[in-house]
Amino acid sequence: MSCPVIELTQQLIRRPSLSPDDAGCQALLIERLQAIGFTVERMDFADTQNFWAWRGQGETLAFAGHTDVVPPGDADRWINPPFEPTIRDGMLFGRGAADMKGSLAAMVVAAERFVAQHPNHTGRLAFLITSDEEASAHNGTVKAVEALMARNERLDYCLVGEPSSIEVVGDVVKNGRRGSLTCNLTIHGVQGHVAYPHLADNPVHRAAPFLNELVAIEWDQGNEFFPATSMQIANIQAGTGSNNVIPGELFVQFNFRFSTELTDEMIKAQVLALLEKHQLRYTVDWWLSGQPFLTARGKLVDAVVNAVEHYNEIKPQLLTTGGTSDGRFIARMGAQVVELGPVNATIHKINECVNAADLQLLARMYQRIMEQLVA
């Protein structure tokens, strides 16, 4: 028996949409949405394709996602070519099956079924889709959100189809994400010969006490919704490669994944105070890739929990763990934001796959969420 969710997922996988190349995925989605009465606005920026689609008016529920995928790696290591979808033992294999073409297909099919049953729905149903989530994300959802905010576009609820589940679909729902702040720090010294240290100033030696103190800081203890803030050193570089040269500079890159207990400005102030305490000469560059956000219990979370309980007979965990997602941009619009998608065990891996039955279940969950919020 054919399944429209599986068929659409396979059509999307066949389009090798390596970020930010959409490879025709959005045209396929747009065609399906326009056929059921959606108005579609393309919002392309530079090399990235985005679209905003809506049907109806009033309180707005948007489904958000991305058509782009990460590179497949060594195609010879796949059980089947990564862009030729295949089903084995109930599992659908292909790059993007779980992240997140399966979710996109489930969203669109859910919308088709919802509109067929509720042609005069009272709220507004919308889609916000990008082709740049996996790469730089500079011209994707963030730019589309800026354009929507500039004209005071309404967005009350947003469901992001990222693969949130761990073992079975719906066992985990993400109702927030930690913030992410990266520090690119250069400590300046004076290069010289290792035999004449009095004529040089070793930045590695200078920075060692600072780094020791930095890694020992307990930034916070988290809260009911977030784990404690984490700081990790990601890269350290110094020296010329020669064993007789004292380096002139030390580069250190470290990243904070921070909770709502802190702001990026609080973190910056503490790091800068520590640098001054240790009397270091430095230059610093900060990159804030996302503020923390949280959607507490409310209409959207309740609708999502209800849908999962109805179709999978489990109570989902509400978590804020993991990396960042495009939900961080959408939250700026004041919307309640939740992530619900398939099992994430194989995302970005060789032989990425998803349980085909899970995608059918996901489409039913999405439809029930629509029925609770905008019918």
Curated annotation (Swiss-Prot):
Enzyme class label:
hydrolase
| Active-site residue numbers | 68, 133
Q: Which UniProt keywords apply?
A: Amino-acid biosynthesis, Cobalt, Diaminopimelate biosynthesis, Hydrolase, Lysine biosynthesis, Metal-binding, Zinc
The record's CDD domains line, in alphabetical order, gives: M20_DapE_proteobac
| One Pfam match | Peptidase_M20
Which pathway is it part of?
Answer: Amino-acid biosynthesis; L-lysine biosynthesis via DAP pathway; LL-2,6-diaminopimelate from (S)-tetrahydrodipicolinate (succinylase route): step 3/3
EC assignment:
3.5.1.18
As its record notes, the protein acts as a catalyst of: N-succinyl-(2S,6S)-2,6-diaminopimelate + H2O = (2S,6S)-2,6-diaminopimelate + succinate
Cofactor(s), by name:
Zn(2+); Co(2+)
Q: Which residues bind Zn(2+) 1 per the record?
A: 66, 99, 162
Of which family is this protein a member? Belongs to the peptidase M20A family. DapE subfamily.
**Under what name is this protein listed?**
Succinyl-diaminopimelate desuccinylase
Give the organism the record lists. Answer: Escherichia coli O157:H7
Q: Which gene encodes it?
A: dapE
